[in-house]
């Protein structure tokens, strides 16, 4: 029997598809730690008859584009190189081992059916999956082996129809995504690296860890700053208008001239009107008016209404919509189309909604009088967003229900009658001047019966006038007003501008808006208004000063046009890339050359590093206090040496009076809280690792200096069981609260609370190979069961320690000390030790005192070149 591998985009989607295609008769098995289950059943496939189906999934993109490793060091690579350096595809989440998982599931399979989302990103993921299984499934790029399912909703009808009408992956659309990824990577990283380093080395209160540039993100910010500039430069202007009060009951009438901007003319016209005691009713006319029902719902309109009507930002709104889609409640939520297909079964959707306790009555009413929906735009991608399955209020959290209810009510509104009302207008003349009043009365609520937020409002009283009669003028007034500035852009208005200018896609628009918020370029105020920060304003003004095209939407619009040509097969992938990269490289060179123009704006708005922060710890070079700058990104700055040192994100304080034995910098203690990660570190070593095997931005728990009582060599206990290269290191920074922390991942083991001293000994556990420890308590506070003050043993195996250690992640510890150097290899339980580190002899840290190194030292390491770097200064 032949086998068919089928791959969906998300685990939940795979489960739904498998249930539908197998008619509920599939069996499931868990994946290998990546959250992706596999569902299996037997059924018929095309002309093959009975086959074995295997349905699994990925978790979004399998691969992501990045630069080669040597280009990822900001300090060593000139950003201009990023426009031409080599790139490579890397696994998006290496911990998931998705390529290995897919290859494993593809073993023995003869066909591949791809159920990825039906958009350009989905096409791109199709080819990532094909690449992962190409060595397992023969001839996987053949149309006779690999098939593509096209669907817009997770319903039995749609899914089974997609299975009967399988197509093939679209390579052109996949390439257009590759081109966009590469352009965004090269352009964004080059500008971001340069301006981040340039400005963070100069100013201390930028309050942003990354000063990013993005071909879509920056024009998006530009719209917000332009509106801010319009508000700031707005000059109010006075104007006047006449207001007439006439009749009984009294009615306020509006002046036909509207506004007059010259006061003397307004006074002259006022005096003319005052010459008359009565007004003549020239006409009283009534007519029916209509308010059109909405068009079918597309992504942009969904985001707009969620922001303006529900107070839910576009990023969160799309997360909710995608969750509703994967659960089968709505159709595919990313679509530009707002017109139903001619064969769309409108009554079927209403039948789905009939049983609802919240809007079932409206659905039943509309079923008896379905109206033809309005015409819209058919973008050729997916049908509009419609409800596919009935959900109840109790099925969702509050925001999810509100989005789902809106989608349901909007659909019902699109097949309802237009709102109809009657407008009565009365026109009166006073000399040469004309005044009028209007009143509206509802005739048919139409679609607003179900879309209650668009309700008509109260009926207005009809004008009490009869044509041809005269009415007494009760009063006439000259009203002075001033023009007002525009308001800040709302998210809804920004989405409209982005759509009009082709900035982003229906899928990426919410991401770009979210990015400018996270980068601290704008703040969201009441009413979902976007107010630019000082940093956002200065950035945009700086781009405008150097090269306005960097912030105008025209550049991105042109890039999107070229990407569309690739997707349509009308343009060559490499030609488009070369052309776009060449243009932006020239712009980058010009930007770097003229950066002083932008710096002049920053100088006015932000404080120099030397004037920022507060005295914190001593520099190892000049022994003066460095300034601690807490605004993002946190860093230390030595104004005497004019050097800046990056810090980890969290709480940083001076670690008692300890100093680094290599460079004499004060040691610091990093912590994210008692239950979080913590470790000591030297600010110089953290930024300039002294050993080749110490990672950049690593703490003392990654340093292999055998002469340091705080290093990995001294305080390492065992290899981490959760990650392949990590070591569990004793953390003494919060003593007498002690814990082991992995120096590579987030594994934490709390132990020996209240102990006064813990020493990592030379001896190893005979059972698991971990280093033994010596634990000391005060006599009146001992937590050993026999009341002893001091005991030695293995943290993980000793019965005396079992009640004092949280063993939830340390059951299968592996040894780390051996006679060899730092190799990073693996060994099984009790298998002779893992070359995690060549540990020196036991070091100890007491809760109240300094470090005590006991015994001799093995495996001493020589610093790579740090002492050479500092030699001239110390001499």
Swiss-Prot record:
Residue ranges annotated for the Toprim domain, each copy included: 3-153
Family note: Belongs to the type IA topoisomerase family.
Root EC class: isomerase
Species for this entry: Drosophila melanogaster (Fruit fly)
Domain of life: Eukaryota
Active site as annotated: 332 (o-(5'-phospho-dna)-tyrosine intermediate)
Catalytic reactions of this protein: ATP-independent breakage of single-stranded DNA, followed by passage and rejoining
Protein known as: DNA topoisomerase 3-beta
Region ranges (Disordered): 371-391
MF terms (GO), sorted A to Z: DNA binding; DNA topoisomerase type I (single strand cut, ATP-independent) activity; RNA topoisomerase activity
Keyword list, A-Z: DNA-binding, Isomerase, Topoisomerase
Name of the encoding gene: Top3beta
């Amino acid at each position: 029997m032949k086998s068919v591998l089928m791959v969906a985009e998300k685990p939940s989607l795979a489960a739904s598809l498998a249930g539908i295609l197998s008619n509920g008769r599939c069996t499931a098995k868990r994946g290998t730690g990546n959250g992706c289950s596999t569902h299996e059943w037997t059924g018929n496939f095309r002309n093959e008859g009975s086959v074995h189906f295997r349905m699994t999934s990925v978790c979004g993109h399998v691969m992501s584009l990045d630069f080669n490793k040597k280009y990822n060091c900001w300090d060593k690579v000139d950003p201009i190189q990023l426009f031409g350096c080599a790139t490579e595809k890397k696994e998006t989440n290496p911990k998931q081992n998705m390529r290995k998982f897919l290859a494993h599931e593809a073993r023995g399979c003869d066909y591949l059916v791809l159920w990825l989302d039906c958009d350009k990103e989905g096409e791109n993921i199709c080819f990532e999956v094909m690449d992962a299984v190409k060595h397992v499934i023969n001839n996987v790029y053949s149309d006779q082996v690999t098939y593509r399912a096209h669907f817009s909703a997770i319903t039995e009808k749609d899914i089974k129809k997609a299975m009967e009408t399988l197509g093939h992956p679209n390579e052109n659309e996949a390439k257009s995504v590759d081109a966009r990824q590469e352009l965004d990577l090269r352009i964004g990283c080059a500008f971001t690296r340069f301006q981040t380093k340039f400005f963070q080395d100069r100013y201390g209160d930028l309050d942003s860890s990354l000063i990013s540039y993005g071909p879509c993100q920056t024009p998006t910010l530009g719209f917000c700053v332009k509106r801010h500039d319009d508000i700031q430069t707005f000059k109010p202007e006075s104007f006047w208008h006449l207001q007439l009060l006439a009749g009984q009951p009294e009615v306020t009438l509006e002046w036909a001239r509207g506004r007059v901007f010259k006061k003397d003319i307004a006074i002259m016209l006022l005096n003319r009107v005052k010459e008359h005691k009565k007004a003549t009713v020239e006409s009283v006319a009534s007519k029916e008016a209509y308010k059109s029902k909405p068009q079918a719902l597309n992504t942009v309109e969904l985001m707009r209404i969620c922001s303006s009507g529900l107070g839910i930002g576009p990023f969160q709104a799309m997360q909710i919509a995608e969750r509703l889609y994967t659960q089968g409640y709505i159709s595919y939520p990313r679509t530009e189309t707002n017109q139903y297909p001619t064969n769309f079964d409108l009554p079927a959707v209403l039948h789905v909604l009939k049983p609802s306790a919240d809007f079932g009555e409206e659905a039943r009413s509309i079923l008896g009088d379905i109206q033809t929906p309005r015409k819209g735009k058919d973008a050729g991608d997916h049908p509009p967003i419609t409800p596919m399955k009935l959900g109840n209020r109790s099925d969702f959290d509050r925001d999810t229900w509100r989005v789902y209810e809106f989608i349901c009510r909007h659909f019902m509104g699109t097949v309802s009658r237009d709102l109809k009302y009657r407008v009565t207008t009365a026109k009166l003349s006073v000399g040469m001047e004309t005044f009028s009043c209007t009143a509206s009365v509802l005739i048919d609520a139409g679609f607003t019966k179900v879309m209650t937020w668009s309700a008509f409002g109260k009926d207005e009283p009809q004008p009490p006038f009869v044509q041809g009669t005269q009415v007494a003028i009760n009063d006439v007034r000259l009203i002075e007003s001033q023009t007002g500035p525009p308001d800040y852009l709302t998210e809804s208005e920004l989405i409209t501008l982005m759509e009009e200018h082709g900035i982003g896609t229906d899928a990426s628009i919410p991401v770009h808006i979210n990015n400018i918020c996270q980068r601290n370029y704008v703040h969201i105020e009441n009413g979902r208004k976007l107010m630019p920060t000082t940093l956002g304003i200065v950035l945009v003004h700086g781009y405008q000063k150097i090269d306005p095209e960097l912030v105008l939407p025209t550049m991105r619009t042109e890039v999107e046009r070229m990407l569309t040509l690739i997707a349509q097969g009308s343009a060559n992938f490499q030609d488009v890339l070369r052309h776009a990269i060449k243009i932006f490289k020239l712009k980058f060179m010009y930007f770097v050359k003229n950066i002083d123009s932008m710096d002049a704006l920053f100088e006015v708005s932000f404080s120099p590093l030397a004037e920022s922060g507060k005295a914190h710890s001593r520099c190892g070079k000049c022994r003066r206090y460095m300034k601690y700058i807490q605004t993002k990104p946190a860093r230390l700055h030595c104004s005497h040496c004019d050097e800046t040192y990056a810090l980890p994100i969290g709480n940083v304080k001076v670690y008692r009076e300890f100093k680094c034995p290599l460079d004499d910098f004060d040691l610091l203690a990093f912590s994210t809280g008692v239950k979080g990660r913590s470790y000591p570190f030297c600010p110089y070593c953290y930024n300039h690792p002294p050993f080749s095997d110490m990672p950049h931005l690593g703490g003392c728990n990654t340093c292999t200096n055998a002469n340091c009582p705080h290093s990995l060599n001294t305080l390492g206990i065992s290899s981490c069981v959760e990650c392949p290269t990590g070591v569990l290191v004793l953390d003494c920074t919060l003593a007498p609260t002690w814990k082991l922390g992995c120096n590579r991942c987030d594994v934490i083991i709390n132990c020996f609370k209240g102990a006064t001293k813990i020493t990592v000994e030379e001896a190893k556990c005979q059972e698991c190979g971990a280093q033994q420890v010596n634990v000391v308590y005060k006599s009146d506070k001992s937590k050993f069961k026999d009341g002893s003050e001091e005991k030695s043993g293995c943290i993980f195996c000793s019965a005396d320690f079992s009640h004092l250690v949280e063993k939830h992640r340390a059951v299968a510890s592996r040894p780390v000390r051996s006679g060899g150097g730092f190799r990073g290899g693996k060994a099984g339980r009790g298998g002779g030790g893992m070359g995690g580190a060549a540990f020196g002899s036991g070091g100890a840290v007491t809760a109240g005192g300094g470090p005590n190194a006991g015994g001799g030292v093995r495996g001493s390491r020589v610093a790579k070149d740090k002492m050479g770097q500092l030699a001239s200064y110390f001499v």
